[in-house]
């Protein structure tokens, strides 16, 4: 699966793991992040620039799922919420860190008729 997201300067900011890199850069400028949704078994692996806003990753993940990006709540390993303006450096994310993509929990019914006081 080939996935790319281009930036203003024509460089790729989000790449799926395993894709060949066209430009030669230092490994320390990128970080590999695992994104896991609460309702799916697999983990999506993304390679992003440390200084790039994580909005690109959020938008691409949401597009793959067919849901608006702002519907998800993205959380880091320590439970901190990741906002669209954060970068991997801001959140101190390291290679292999997992980001949880959670959907809001909604209930579908009113007061219980089973327990009456």
From Swiss-Prot:
Cross-link for Glycyl lysine isopeptide (Gly-Lys) (interchain with K-? in acceptor proteins), residue positions: 108
Q: Which residue ranges have biased composition labelled Basic and acidic residues?
A: 10-28
Q: Which Pfam families match?
A: Rad60-SLD
One of the record's GO cellular component terms = nucleus
Chief localisation class: nucleus
Indicate where this protein resides in the cell: Nucleus; Cytoplasm
Q: How does it assemble?
A: Interacts with SAE2, SCE1, SIZ1 and MMS21 Covalently attached to a number of proteins.
**Which species is listed as the source?**
Arabidopsis thaliana
Protein name per its UniProtKB record: Putative small ubiquitin-related modifier 6
Q: Which InterPro entries match?
A: Rad60/SUMO-like_dom, Ubiquitin-like_dom, Ubiquitin-like_domsf
Q: Region (Disordered): which ranges?
A: 1-30
Gene3D superfamilies the record matches: Phosphatidylinositol 3-kinase Catalytic Subunit, Chain A, domain 1
Question: What top-level branch of life does the organism fall under?
Answer: Eukaryota
Q: Which PROSITE patterns match?
A: UBIQUITIN_2
Q: Which family does it belong to?
A: Belongs to the ubiquitin family. SUMO subfamily.
Respond yes or no to whether keyword Zinc is given for this record. no
This chain's function reads: Ubiquitin-like protein which can be covalently attached to target lysines as a monomer. Does not seem to be involved in protein degradation and may function as an antagonist of ubiquitin in the degradation process.
Q: What further fact does the record state?
A: Stress conditions rapidly and substantially elevates the amount of SUMO1 and SUMO2 conjugates with a concomitant reduction in the amount of free SUMO proteins. The SUMO conjugation system plays an important function in stress protection and/or repair.
Q: Where is the Ubiquitin-like domain?
A: 31-108
Q: Which UniProt keywords apply?
A: Cytoplasm, Isopeptide bond, Nucleus, Ubl conjugation pathway
């Amino acid at each position: 699966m080939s996935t790319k997201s281009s930036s203003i300067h024509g460089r790729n900011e989000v790449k799926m793991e395993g894709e060949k890199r066209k430009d030669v850069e230092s490994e320390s400028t990128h970080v590999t992040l695992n994104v896991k949704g609460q309702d799916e078994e697999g983990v999506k692996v993304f390679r992003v620039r440390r200084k790039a806003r994580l909005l690109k990753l959020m938008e691409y993940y949401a597009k793959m799922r067919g849901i608006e990006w702002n519907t998800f709540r993205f959380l880091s390993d320590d439970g901190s919420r990741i906002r669209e303006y954060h970068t991997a450096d801001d959140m101190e994310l390291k290679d292999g860190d997992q980001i949880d993509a959670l959907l809001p929990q909604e209930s579908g019914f009113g007061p219980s008729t089973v327990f009456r006081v």
